[in-house]
Amino acid sequence: MPPRDAVPTSTQVSGIGADGVQTEKVLKNRPKASALRQQKLPAWQPILTATTVIPTVFVIGAIFLPIGVFLFIASDAVSEFTVEYTNCLSPCQLQINLPNAFDGDVFLYYNLENYYQNHRRYVKSRNDQQYLGDLTNVKDCAPFDIDPATKKPIAPCGAIANSIFNDTFTLAHRADTGIVTMVPVTTQGVIWNVDKDRKFKNPPLNDGNLCDAFNNTTKPPNWSKNPCEVGGFENVDFIVWMRTAALPYFKKLWRIVDRTTNPLFSNGLPQGTYILTVENNYPVQSFGGKKEFVISTTSWAGGKNSFLGIAYLVVGSLAIVLGVVFIVIHMKFGHSMNELSNVSEIHH
């Protein structure tokens, strides 16, 4: 007998046509008689009993609870200070009193609230080929593709680039003696290596002049400076802004405190008074937005965010509670193993 997979894939079916002549119709699409094609593969379905479910629930709780504790402790160890400056008149000066020292690497962020960078038309309004140096490629950038007045391509093009965040910050430490020291900051480590190395490149330079390379383009309408004056496509703030956020409340890294240039900040930011000066240029009132400046450290789990730790604690606690409930139900209404074995013998 031939193997099952060797069954022919075509079958002849006999019949009588309208003219009374016997005809044969060949069926060519018959699947092979294999277990996979005939959906006859062996299957296994676990039998859920009290002796398997209850230990499993307790194991889940025992795993999730310590993970939640570690995540919550890591988040709680992060030092963070937030100051809102939405309605502060530019130039705006705000006094910040750090209650404790921010040890280690200190990161400076800006927060935006009620800003939907995830809007479909907004996210698609960009051209990654242009950001690699192809200045004339403005596909998908409408309405910020061609300047109506000069008929030149806009570079960088697109709605995301046109709406770049342009507030500027300076942070200074004021000692008890009244001496004011500027906090040194750096852009090293602000952007991802994949963005810097593969996604954003300036066009080839003409005689080493970036402005000559951008000569046949025009700046986005909302930009106050020409791109060549701020580093072109390789501008750090531009690259950070182009990585769009998924939620309407987001935080983007602005700078990192430079711990190598001044001994006062070698261990981070010392406790004390700071003066934050803001050039408040970015309008958010039209859509009910809010702007904040954030000073933060990090831990092995990232920045300050207790949600993940709380989520693990809640799931772990629910698993333990459900395990106890299942034990009570099993002891009160369940059957013993002897009873189950007797029932099995009766049926056999």
From Swiss-Prot:
Per UniProt, the keywords (alphabetical) are: Cell membrane, Endoplasmic reticulum, Endosome, Membrane, Transmembrane, Transmembrane helix
Family annotation (Pfam families): CDC50
Where is this protein found?
Answer: Cell membrane; Early endosome membrane; Recycling endosome membrane; Endoplasmic reticulum
Q: Which residues form a coiled coil?
A: none
The transmembrane segments are 53-73, 309-329
Q: GO terms for CC?
A: early endosome membrane; endoplasmic reticulum; Golgi apparatus; plasma membrane; recycling endosome membrane
Q: What kind of membrane protein is this, topologically?
A: Multi-pass membrane protein
* Family matches, as InterPro entries: CDC50/LEM3_fam
Summarize what gene deletion causes: RNAi-mediated knockdown results in the appearance of abnormal vacuoles in the intestines and defective recycling of endocytic cargo with the accumulation of cargo within abnormal early endosomes.
Predominant location of this chain? membrane
Q: Which family does it belong to?
A: Belongs to the CDC50/LEM3 family.
The UniProt function text for this chain reads: Probable chaperone protein for the phospholipid-transporting ATPase tat-1. Regulates cell membrane structure and function. Plays a role in maintaining the membrane phosphatidylserine asymmetry and the formation of the tubular membrane structure. Involved in membrane trafficking and is specifically involved in the recycling and degradation of endocytic cargo and this is likely with the phospholipid-transporting ATPase tat-1.
- State what protein this is by name: CDC50 family protein chat-1
Q: Which organism encodes this protein?
A: Caenorhabditis elegans
Q: What is this protein's gene name?
A: chat-1
